[in-house]
């Protein structure tokens, strides 16, 4: 397969192989974005592809600036995995459909307010709470085919005898509202992390992260109750890294 780590230029790394085709526009966006002020390092994942001015599937490291436009509108987009009590040997499509019902169940306005009383922009997006969204977002039942490290599978509570429920979703309209607000105020320029604007963005960003995570819980909740699920793992896309002192934090690039 060849070397999977390539460095086409200083400060840029591609995680790929010679056999993997990458879109030229995505690589162009990667190089252009890497020249933005305060970006000291850029890394592209194997699934890199063109986005709205910035590549999707890449990570960028900064030390002083935050780029809301680079992070994108689907703040907190990620995947959570639960193991259900549904047995793999007893799979029946009709029965599963009846047991699981509708995976997209919006919450009422009062439920949203009680869950997130401090997130003001959310009041405009109550209709999206508890829903999956579009694009490549999904909720699906999965089955383990091969376990490569049994100790890790046991540690996070996964086995081949039960079905797993995976939910891929983000912050829905909330993340877009946060991004739109900052684009109207500051355009695509970077924000100094310790400035009032930077702190304001980080507060809203972290609220959207918490909302996105709990929204995946809400999507799975009806099926958690019915199937006695236990959440095994959560993974979040994390493409801009900002470091201050010894405490780095991570944020994602753009909605898929």
Model-derived segments and their meaning:
Residues 82:
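Iron-sulfur (Fe-S) cluster-binding segments and ferredoxin-like electron-carrier domains
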Residues 104, 110-117:
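Long, basic N-terminal domains or extensions that often function
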Residues 71:
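Active/ligand-binding-proximal structured segments within catalytic/core domains
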Residues 34:
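Glycine-rich loop/turn
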Residues 2-29, 37-43, 50-56, 64-68, ...:
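Domain-length cofactor-binding catalytic modules of enzymes
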């Amino acid at each position: 397969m060849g070397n999977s780590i390539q460095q086409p230029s200083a400060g840029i790394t591609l995680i790929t192989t010679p056999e993997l085709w990458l879109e030229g526009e995505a690589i162009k966006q990667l190089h252009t974005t890497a020249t933005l002020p305060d970006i000291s390092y850029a890394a592209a994942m194997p699934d890199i592809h063109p986005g709205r001015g910035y590549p999707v599937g890449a990570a960028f490291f900064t030390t002083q600036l935050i780029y809301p436009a680079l992070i994108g509108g689907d703040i907190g987009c990620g995947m959570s995995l639960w193991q259900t009590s549904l047995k793999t040997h007893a799979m029946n499509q009709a029965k599963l459909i009846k047991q699981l019902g509708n995976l997209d169940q919006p919450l009422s306005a009062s439920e949203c307010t009680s869950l997130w009383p401090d997130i003001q922009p959310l009041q405009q997006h109550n209709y999206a709470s508890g829903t999956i969204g579009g694009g490549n977002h999904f909720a699906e039942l999965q089955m383990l085919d091969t376990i490569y490290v049994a100790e890790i599978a046991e540690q996070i509570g996964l086995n081949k005898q039960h079905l797993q429920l995976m939910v891929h979703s983000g912050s829905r309209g909330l993340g877009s509202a946060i991004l739109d607000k900052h684009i109207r105020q500051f355009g695509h320029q970077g924000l100094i992390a310790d400035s009032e604007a930077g702190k304001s963005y980080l507060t809203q960003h972290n609220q959207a992260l918490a909302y996105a995570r709990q929204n995946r819980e809400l999507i799975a909740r009806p099926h958690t109750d019915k199937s006695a699920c236990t959440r095994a793992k959560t993974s979040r896309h994390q493409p801009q890294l900002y470091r201050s002192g010894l405490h780095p934090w991570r944020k994602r690039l753009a909605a898929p």
